Amino acid sequence: MNALTAVQNNAVDSGQDYSGFTLIPSAQSPRLLELTFTEQTTKQFLEQVAEWPVQALEYKSFLRFRVGKILDDLCANQLQPLLLKTLLNRAEGALLINAVGVDDVKQADEMVKLATAVAHLIGRSNFDAMSGQYYARFVVKNVDNSDSYLRQPHRVMELHNDGTYVEEITDYVLMMKIDEQNMQGGNSLLLHLDDWEHLDHYFRHPLARRPMRFAAPPSKNVSKDVFHPVFDVDQQGRPVMRYIDQFVQPKDFEEGVWLSELSDAIETSKGILSVPVPVGKFLLINNLFWLHGRDRFTPHPDLRRELMRQRGYFAYATNHYQTHQ
């Protein structure tokens, strides 16, 4: 663990009871909490949002906040503050969320509604240029000919932050498992910056704050390059990152060597968590101090995994919450 931030007591330690959901520490780390909506909450939520198909959420963006309010009301208005406090808490910042009874690809639309409600209790999901919507659904199969590692099954997708090649703020990332067939392996990989043993070395390097060019492949539907440093600081001066090895474009030998060494130091960290995410569950993480990736799959001719992602910015009343507390 890095000396910059120690794990503090979290909301789970208080023994607080919540209405409509349960909250426990994950088996992988006290930084990652597991939130489960009860069967009754799930049933009532899906009944109350049934009048709006997913297309309505796509066309009318205010409905995304309305379904969020419905879910929060069903949880006695305890859900929204819990989500924000957890995601803004540097000692935590990550949740594995599921709803009892939502665990089959036939419920894909219900999954999108649930994830949308949760995301819009903490902020707003950005436009995803790859899909043309506020969310993206994509499939991983046994054979892939795409132009990035996103869908390639037989190799590790290295740890990274999202939103590195766009100008929009990307405070959070939501990653949901919609379907899985003939799958072995492929766990989500997570690394909290303060558990990365090499953070001090790279954060204090002269190249850490140099603006670098980030460019996306054609499949991302983003044609404009963006420039920013790999490292920055939050409001309390603690390290945050905007990094992905596939899309950063070093301008010279010095940057190329440093980035290569940085990548190796991240991928070999002893602080990496391997987290299984069953169908219907989703990870919600603070994108500024958590890196995420994916382990490799065992080959199978009929391998299939469908995922849904949302990523966006935090929006909350500043008199109630402190950024990156």
Swiss-Prot record:
Key words of the record: Dioxygenase, Iron, Metal-binding, Oxidoreductase
What domain of life does the UniProt record list for this protein's source? Answer: Bacteria
Cite a single Pfam family from the UniProt record: CsiD
Would the keyword Metal-binding turn up in this protein's UniProt record? yes
Catalytic activity reads:
glutarate + 2-oxoglutarate + O2 = (S)-2-hydroxyglutarate + succinate + CO2
GO biological process assignments: L-lysine catabolic process
Q: In which pathway does it act?
A: Amino-acid degradation
Q: CDD domains from the entry? A: CAS_like
- What cofactor is this protein dependent on? Fe(2+)
Question: What does the note accompanying the cofactor annotation read?
Answer: Binds 1 Fe(2+) ion per subunit.
Q: Does the keyword Zinc-finger apply?
A: no
One molecular function GO term is:
ferrous iron binding
The residues that hold Fe cation are 160, 162, 292
Gene3D superfamilies found in the cross-reference section:
Clavaminate synthase-like
- What EC designation does it have? 1.14.11.64
What quaternary structure, including any partners, is listed in this protein's UniProt entry? Homotetramer.
Its biological purpose is as follows:
Acts as an alpha-ketoglutarate-dependent dioxygenase catalyzing hydroxylation of glutarate (GA) to L-2-hydroxyglutarate (L2HG). Functions in a L-lysine degradation pathway that proceeds via cadaverine, glutarate and L-2-hydroxyglutarate.
What family, per the record?
Belongs to the glutarate hydroxylase family.
Q: What is this protein called?
A: Glutarate 2-hydroxylase
